[in-house]
Curated annotation (Swiss-Prot):
Organism: Chelonia mydas (Green sea-turtle)
Role noted for this protein: Growth hormone plays an important role in growth control and is involved in the regulation of several anabolic processes. Implicated as an osmoregulatory substance important for seawater adaptation.
Family assignment from sequence similarity: Belongs to the somatotropin/prolactin family.
GO biological process, one term: growth hormone receptor signaling pathway
Primary residence: secreted
Name of the molecule in the record: Somatotropin
UniProt GO MF annotations: growth factor activity; growth hormone receptor binding; hormone activity; metal ion binding
GO cellular component: extracellular space
């Protein structure tokens, strides 16, 4: 949870949590690819994966330049929507990765997402300018991961979902870093 603390600390904590989750998602994606997806299929699927991400339907910024045009509150809202869209499906990850070294902590991914959700909500409360009143967070979600790893369709579905998970967490990490840099102007700001 996020106790009362300075805004700079709230941002620092949220960025660290987002970085950790993005790294975990990237490692999991790579491990899944290495374990289940034949080399010749890896590149042919990349194009179809990007089209199937739910997050593509959200009018969220897609790049750094686009994100720089948005207010901090808008970026926090987009981040919250992205995080919340994964809360349900991520609970099925541990069943998919029963023997995984990377996802040995998969049961904790849900808790880590909830922590990040709380951190983003704490930032939203701190920055609240009245625009949150009446703001209804939609709770659309991704499909659940398929635990049948003997089925090629299920493998490709999970591969696509992991790709989306990685991309979405990268977006959240980027948005949070951008806001932190904008607010606190650190000289070593790299996004």
């Amino acid at each position: 949870a996020f106790p009362a603390m300075p805004l700079s600390s709230l941002f620092a904590n949220a960025v660290l949590r987002a970085q950790h989750l993005h790294l975990l998602a990237a490692d999991t994606y790579k491990e899944f690819e290495r374990t289940y997806i034949p080399e010749e299929q890896r590149h042919s699927n990349k194009i179809s994966q990007s089209a199937s991400c739910y997050s593509e339907t959200i009018p969220a910024p897609t790049g750094k330049d686009d994100a720089e045009q948005k207010s901090d509150m808008e970026l926090l809202r987009f981040s919250l929507i992205l995080i919340q869209s994964w809360l349900n499906p991520v609970q099925f990850l541990s069943r998919v990765f029963t023997n995984s070294l990377v996802f040995g902590t998969s049961d904790r991914v849900y808790e880590k997402l909830r922590d990040l959700e709380e951190g983003i909500q704490a930032l939203m409360r701190e920055l609240e300018d009245g625009s949150l009143r009446g703001f209804q967070v939609l709770r659309p979600t991704y499909d659940k991961f398929d635990i049948n790893l003997r089925n090629e369709d299920a493998l490709l579905k999970n591969y696509g979902l992991l790709s989306c998970f990685k991309k979405d967490l990268h977006k959240v990490e980027t948005y949070l870093k951008l806001m932190k840099c904008r607010r606190f102007g650190e000289s070593n700001c790299t996004i």
